[in-house]
């Protein structure tokens, strides 16, 4: 994953994902409506960098993590929106969660893909950068 180098304008930093997990769920709101919940956790190391500066400093790591979280959030949000608005298809299997978790609701609906297309998305992304995978900082 490539993000901006906060210490050198116009330069990039690549993050090598070393660990990741994702959870998806359907939430039932107080008003009886459903929503999509996706939680993503990832860890990574700084792979390559363009430009100069110490990217592993305590001041810079949070900036990189924030950028990484926003990048992942934007990509996931875009993918879900495509499935909902363009393809109108639940390619993620949220309908199966509804069927298992809310069987009575499932029995009452007729067109899941139509319902899926209108569900709000709640997305939580946590990205941790552990350090540098580079042999040396230059």
What role is predicted for each listed range?
Residues 1-138:
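Active-site environment of non-heme Fe oxygenases that use a 2-His-1-carboxylate facial triad
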């Amino acid at each position: 994953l490539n993000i901006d180098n906060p210490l050198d304008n116009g330069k990039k930093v690549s993050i090598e994902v070393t660990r990741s997990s994702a959870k998806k769920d359907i939430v039932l709101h107080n008003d009886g409506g459903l929503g999509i919940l996706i939680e993503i956790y990832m860890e990574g190391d700084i792979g390559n960098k363009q430009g100069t500066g110490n990217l592993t400093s305590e001041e810079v790591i949070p900036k990189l993590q924030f950028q990484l979280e926003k990048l992942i959030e934007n990509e996931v949000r875009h993918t879900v929106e495509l499935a909902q608005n363009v393809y109108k298809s639940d390619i993620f299997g949220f309908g199966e969660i509804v069927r298992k978790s809310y069987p009575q609701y499932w029995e009452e609906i007729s067109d899941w893909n139509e319902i899926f297309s209108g569900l709000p998305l709640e997305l939580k992304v946590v990205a941790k950068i552990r350090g540098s995978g580079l042999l040396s900082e230059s």
